[in-house]
């Protein structure tokens, strides 16, 4: 019996992925800020006081309520980037998957077998979409700078920064970003598909229940974060530099190995698995559950 999934409409994919992105940013933006600040920190943290200073920066001595509000820098950029990213990734991957199914299904099936071939097409489609995600890089750069290096903004808005710095500078690190996204998205969608195929035994992935989507999203998210961790550290350090003090990815790799050792490339992995992991699982499972439901509503 052929392993085929029911197709959803483009509008359903747009609504489902956008809803997942909006709900994710509302819940997880402060967590993302903490993770980015830990990854950008070059010193060893040996006490709770030092951790407090790294996370809250100049506001570390203020009351807890005020400190918590400082974890929402760059929310406008973050919201714009996250919603567009989720729409592009979660809504776009099915289109890439359909393209591969239409033109290369036989090749994948001959190479990997029918069941594994289906999962590999899903992974390959995710990788293609992940590489194309660099078009959104300027918003990601501004989001990270607002989270980790807010003084580089100096009161400037988006248009002023674009005029002052030039669009090219906002695409700084695009090669490293593509190199990170390709295996990361491959592992995300591939892990998700393999879990549905081999652990859950689903024939039509779109018919997965919320709990099944949750389980498969855990597998995909953990695989993605582990695979992309080293390149994610490099990408983050490229992007959080001052606009007037850029540093190449190769120089960052060299200096990191020299000053911090190879384990530095996995800095922030544990908090990222504990923080970004649930965030990615949440939005991925939500998008996979909402898209078929929106499709059913729109088809009535």
UniProtKB/Swiss-Prot annotation:
Protein name, per record: Mitochondrial GTP/GDP carrier protein 1
Membership in a protein family: Belongs to the mitochondrial carrier (TC 2.A.29) family.
InterPro entries: Mito_GTP/GDP_Carrier, Mitochondrial_sb/sol_carrier, Mt_carrier_dom_sf
UniProt-listed GO biological process terms: guanine nucleotide transport; intracellular iron ion homeostasis; mitochondrial genome maintenance; transmembrane transport
Transmembrane segments: 14-34, 85-101, 122-142, 173-189, 214-234, 268-285
Annotated keywords: Membrane, Mitochondrion, Mitochondrion inner membrane, Repeat, Transmembrane, Transmembrane helix, Transport
Subcellular location: Mitochondrion inner membrane
Native organism: Saccharomyces cerevisiae (strain ATCC 204508 / S288c) (Baker's yeast)
GO molecular function: guanine nucleotide transmembrane transporter activity
GO cellular component: mitochondrial inner membrane; mitochondrion
Membrane-related topology note: Multi-pass membrane protein
PROSITE patterns found in the cross-reference section: SOLCAR
Solcar repeat extents: 8-108, 117-198, 208-293
Domain of life: Eukaryota
PANTHER family attached to this UniProt entry: MITOCHONDRIAL GTP/GDP CARRIER PROTEIN 1, MITOCHONDRIAL GTP_GDP CARRIER PROTEIN 1
Transmembrane recorded as keyword: yes
Function: Mitochondrial GTP/GDP transporter required for GTP uptake and GDP exit from mitochondria. Involved in mitochondrial iron transport and essential for mitochondrial genome maintenance.
SUPFAM superfamilies: Mitochondrial carrier
Pfam families: Mito_carr (PF00153)
Keyword hit for Nucleotide-binding: no
């Amino acid at each position: 019996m052929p392993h085929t999934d029911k197709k959803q409409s483009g509008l359903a994919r747009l609504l489902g992925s956008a809803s997942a992105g909006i709900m994710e940013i509302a819940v997880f933006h402060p967590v993302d800020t903490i993770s980015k600040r830990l990854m950008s920190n070059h010193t060893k943290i040996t006490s709770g006081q030092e951790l407090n200073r790294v996370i809250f920066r100049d506001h570390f001595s203020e009351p807890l309520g005020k400190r918590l509000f400082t974890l929402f820098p760059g929310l406008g950029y973050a919201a714009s980037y996250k919603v567009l990213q989720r729409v592009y990734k979660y809504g776009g991957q099915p289109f890439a998957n359909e393209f591969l199914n239409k033109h290369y299904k036989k090749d994948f099936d001959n190479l990997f077998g029918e069941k594994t071939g289906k999962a590999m097409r899903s992974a390959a489609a995710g990788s293609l979409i992940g590489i194309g995600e660099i078009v959104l890089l300027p918003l990601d750069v501004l989001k990270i700078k607002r989270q980790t290096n807010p003084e580089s903004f100096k009161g400037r808005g988006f248009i002023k920064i674009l005029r002052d710095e030039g669009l090219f500078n906002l695409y700084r690190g695009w090669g490293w970003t593509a190199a990170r996204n390709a295996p990361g998205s491959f592992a995300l969608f591939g892990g998700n598909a393999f879990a549905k195929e081999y652990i859950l035994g689903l024939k039509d992935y779109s018919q997965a229940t919320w709990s099944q989507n949750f389980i498969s999203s855990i597998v995909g998210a953990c695989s993605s974060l582990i695979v992309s961790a080293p390149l994610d550290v490099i990408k983050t350090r490229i992007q959080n530099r001052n606009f007037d003090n850029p540093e190449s990815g190769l120089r960052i790799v060299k200096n990191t190995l020299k000053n911090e050792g190879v384990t530095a490339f996995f800095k922030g992995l544990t908090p990222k698995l504990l923080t970004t992991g649930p965030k990615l699982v949440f939005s991925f499972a939500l998008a996979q559950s909402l898209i078929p439901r929106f499709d059913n509503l729109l088809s009535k």
